[in-house]
Curated annotation (Swiss-Prot):
Organism for this UniProt entry: Rattus norvegicus (Rat)
Record-given protein name: Protein preY, mitochondrial
One Pfam family named in its UniProt record: Trm112p
Known partners and oligomeric status: Interacts (via TRM112 domain) with NDUFAF5; the interaction is direct and stabilizes NDUFAF5 protein. Interacts with COQ5; the interaction is direct, stabilizes COQ5 protein and associates PYURF with COQ enzyme complex.
Keyword terms, alphabetized: Mitochondrion, Transit peptide
Length: 112
């Protein structure tokens, strides 16, 4: 049974495939773009719009966040964490956040 399945699979892979009618229509559609066209537009850096801050809150504390343009991060000063913004999209996953109070914690441990 396995050999029959393998044989059918190898025969199917060796045959030249004709595009379906739907695929042909999609390729000829006026909005269809090549991969090169998409790469040209993707090179432009996307920026974060600070107007989004009124809708975004920290997923851990549910408190508003502060945008830091120099580091391109959303900062929660209360918890001391910063969420990165990648291609204009905030990464609000808590595991992706970095701590901002690391230096303060190191100084406290040295004093004790």
């Amino acid at each position: 049974m396995l050999t029959t399945t393998c044989r059918r699979l190898s025969q199917a892979l060796q045959r030249p495939h004709a595009l379906s009618a739907v695929a042909q229509r999609c390729l000829r559609a006026p909005g269809a773009r090549s991969y090169a066209d998409q790469n040209e537009k993707a090179e432009q850096p996307r920026t974060f719009h600070p107007a989004l801050l009124q809708f975004l809150v920290c997923p851990l504390s549910k408190k508003p966040l502060r945008y830091d343009a120099s580091t391109n991060e959303l900062i929660n000063d209360e918890l001391g964490i910063a969420y990165p913004i990648i291609d204009g999209v905030p990464n609000m996953i808590p595991q992706a956040a970095r701590t901002t109070r690391q230096k303060e914690k190191q100084e406290e441990t040295k004093q004790h």
